[in-house]
């Protein structure tokens, strides 16, 4: 007879398979998933700039990047608040994924109004052997890859603003910035079930308005994932499927969600990573965006300076992301 623990493991493995079928994550024999399939295309080189450790969606975003073979993570830079502790958290995730060789650079330290909810988990991560400055790291990597590097910015834009201030000409040599930030036509909690609340001052923008203003004026191609398209709820069914899949990453995400202390994560930041891999997941509209002093991203008349995703299909997103989060961790060779 199988032990109770063995029967429980078999049960949850079965539930994970059923869950993937329900969300469309497992293609039938002879079929392929046209979104996110890996061909012979060169890898997308990214730097991820993140305020990981407050809300839990940054961890899901980093996990998605680590589990996506289409991406080469050139480095991770930490933004806002206690950037050294955030860097320890990133190093721990990379170490446990077998990806410790990825550079982690510490950004500009600031005061933060937000609680570092996952600090206890982060404190178990390794400290830096030698501190790498995030702003200089970003500019150095752009110089090495002119026109070939994507910056995925999923936190307040302090490091970005400092890089523009330090060397705007080099910053303009980025291929693009994929930004989780802003609110163009919809705000927080606007999920289509009640009258529109209208745009709001979104957190990543309002934390450092001056930096956001520098970015939209920089001349770099900006692909903006605002609140309009990123309020993606990881509901109870998906959480049960994901957190009972016994892998390194799913274990981390379960622990971090528990430390975060709320029931249902909204995976704002994961959409920015998903877009960097597969733009079909969040079709964009060219707009002219201005950032006002209150942190609103205003849609105004004039020559477009950004491409914004104003609507997304949550089901397609989760069909893309869930199988990646759930697959066994495969360290880069």
Label the model's feature ranges:
Residues 9, 14-15, 145, 172:
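Generic hydrophobic-segment detector
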Residues 2, 13-16, 323-327:
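Position-driven detector of the extreme protein N-terminus
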Residues 12-25:
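Bacterial N-terminal signal peptides
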Residues 28-333:
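N-terminal acidic, glycine/proline-rich low-complexity segments
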Residues 1-8:
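N-terminal secretory signal peptides that target proteins for export/translocation
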């Amino acid at each position: 007879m199988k032990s109770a623990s063995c029967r429980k493991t078999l049960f949850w493995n079965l539930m994970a398979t059923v869950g993937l079928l329900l969300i469309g994550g497992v293609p039938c024999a002879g079929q392929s998933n046209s979104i996110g399939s890996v061909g012979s295309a060169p890898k997308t080189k990214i730097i991820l700039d993140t305020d990981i450790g407050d809300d839990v969606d940054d961890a899901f975003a980093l996990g998605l990047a680590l589990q996506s073979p289409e991406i080469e993570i050139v480095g991770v830079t930490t933004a806002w608040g206690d950037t050294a502790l955030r860097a320890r958290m990133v190093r721990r995730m990379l170490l446990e994924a077998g990806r410790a060789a990825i550079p982690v650079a510490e950004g500009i330290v600031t005061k933060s109004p937000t609680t570092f909810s996952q600090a206890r988990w982060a404190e178990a991560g390794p400290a830096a052997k030698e501190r790498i400055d995030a702003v200089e790291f970003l500019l150095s990597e752009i110089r090495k890859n002119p026109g070939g590097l994507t910056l995925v910015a999923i936190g307040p834009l302090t490091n970005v603003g400092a890089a523009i201030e330090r060397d705007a000409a080099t910053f303009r040599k980025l291929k693009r910035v994929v930004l989780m930030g802003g609110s163009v036509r919809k705000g927080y909690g606007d999920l289509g079930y009640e009258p529109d609340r209208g745009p709001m001052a979104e957190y990543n923008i309002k934390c450092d308005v001056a930096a956001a203003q520098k970015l939209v004026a920089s001349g770099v191609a900006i692909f903006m994932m605002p609140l309009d398209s990123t309020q993606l709820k990881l509901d109870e069914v998906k959480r049960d499927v994901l957190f009972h899949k016994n892998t390194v990453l799913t274990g981390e995400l379960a622990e971090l969600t528990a430390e975060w202390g709320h029931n249902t994560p909204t995976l704002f930041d994961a959409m920015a990573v998903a877009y960097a891999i597969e733009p079909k997941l969040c079709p964009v509209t060219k707009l002219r965006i201005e950032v006002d002093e209150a942190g609103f991203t205003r849609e105004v008349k004039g020559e477009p300076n950004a491409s914004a995703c104003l609507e997304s299909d949550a089901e397609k997103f989760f069909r893309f992301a869930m199988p990646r989060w759930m697959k066994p961790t495969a360290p880069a060779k």
